[in-house]
Amino acid sequence: MEKFKIIKTIPKICGAFIFLLFFTFLFGHYGELKTQASDEYPGNFKITSHNVYLFSRNIYPNWGQMHRADLIAQADYMKNNDVVILNEAFDTSASHRLLNNLREMYPHQTPVIGRSKHGWDKTEGNYSNFALEDGGVAVVSQWPIVEKSQHIFQRGGGADRLSNKGFAYVKIMKNGKPYHIIGTHTPADDSLISKDTSRAIRAEQMQEIQTFIAKKNIPKDEIIFIGGDLNVNYGTDEYHDMFKLLNVSSPANFNGQMATWDPTTNSMLKESYPKAAPEYLDYIFVENGHARPHSWHNKVLHTKSPQWSVKSWFKTYTYQDFSDHYPVVGFTDNN
């Protein structure tokens, strides 16, 4: 009887031993694979996004656009990125100057969206040859851009109805690995329309971005970044809705100051908006439906420019900022 019990027990012991070996192998190697993914792909990419406030000099002649195009290109925050997303590069001469100044560091560049169909692999959306303004977004890269498309939003709000605003999509190859980047600029609240309408238009535009991603059929093991001036203030109800609309998550950490548009510290805003509260409007997200690094952080860089001056109506104005927005950098623990 005892012999029979021992024989019956042997398969159970063997089964438990085999399970233990499998468990150890699986989770031991999973940990190794997880570390490799973070260290090599996709966890080795750094992006900076900056709204550079290069409005048309025909409308705003006194904001030092040409001079700031030189200062921005020389700024420390522009160095050592994999990719830079530019917003509000509207003025044709100033944006050309900025892009040319950046070309040595970032030889691979898109045109400014909405200015022309030339230089793009594909143009989608509501592009108009009669728009009074382009979309102001461009992407520059250290690494080869193997695909670039521009998409013009179906609907704009307020003054944006006169422009070709939308987003730039690029596929970049870094060391043989693909990285997908969408740079965009959704509309700010506008006195010509209600805040509810502005919010609804931003939501529609974010849905257009997700529709574009779905149609691209990008492999699930490749990473997608979405960045730019989204004009959604941190911590609001709209901020939380944005995660679902774009299918993104909040960065693990927000480092630096908690404002990208701040009249209390920015010399270009103090006179125009002396009573306005600071806002956090610019972000760089990782899309949830595809590859993700182990951690992703956003940091606002409250960096100051060398002093520059302009004259208007016989008065000299001096500033010490690159733009009315501060740049944001997105990075992993490996950067």
Curated annotation (Swiss-Prot):
Places the protein is found: Secreted
One Gene Ontology term, aspect cellular component: extracellular region
Transmembrane annotation, as ranges: none
GO molecular function, one term: sphingomyelin phosphodiesterase activity
EC number from the UniProt entry: 3.1.4.12
One of the GO biological process terms: killing of cells of another organism
Listed InterPro entries: Endo/exonu/phosph_ase_sf, Endo/exonuclease/phosphatase, Sph/SMPD2-like, Sphingomyelinase/PLipase_C
Main location: secreted
Pfam families from the UniProt entry: Exo_endo_phos
CDD domains: nSMase
Catalytic activity: a sphingomyelin + H2O = phosphocholine + an N-acylsphing-4-enine + H(+)
Keyword field contains Signal: yes
Signal peptide: 1-28
Record keywords: Cytolysis, Hemolysis, Hydrolase, Secreted, Signal, Virulence
EC primary class: hydrolase
Effect of loss of the gene: A knockout mutant was shown to be weakly hemolytic on sheep blood agar, does not produce the external halo of incomplete hemolysis characteristic of L.ivanovii and does not give the typical shovel-shaped cooperative hemolytic 'CAMP-like' reaction that happens with Rhodococcus equi. Is also much less virulent for mice infected intravenously.
Entry keyword Hydrolase: yes
Note: Complementation with SmcL of a mutant lacking the membrane-damaging determinants hly, PlcA and PlcB (thus unable to grow intracellularly) was sufficient to promote bacterial intracellular proliferation.
UniProt similarity note: Belongs to the neutral sphingomyelinase family.
General function of this protein: Virulence factor that promotes intracellular proliferation by mediating the disruption of the phagocytic vacuole and the release of bacteria into the host cell cytosol. May act in concert with the phospholipases PlcA and PlcB and the hemolysin hly to mediate efficient escape from the vacuole.
NCBIfam families: sphingomy (TIGR03395)
UniProt name for this protein: Sphingomyelinase C
Natural source organism: Listeria ivanovii
Gene name for this UniProt entry: smcL
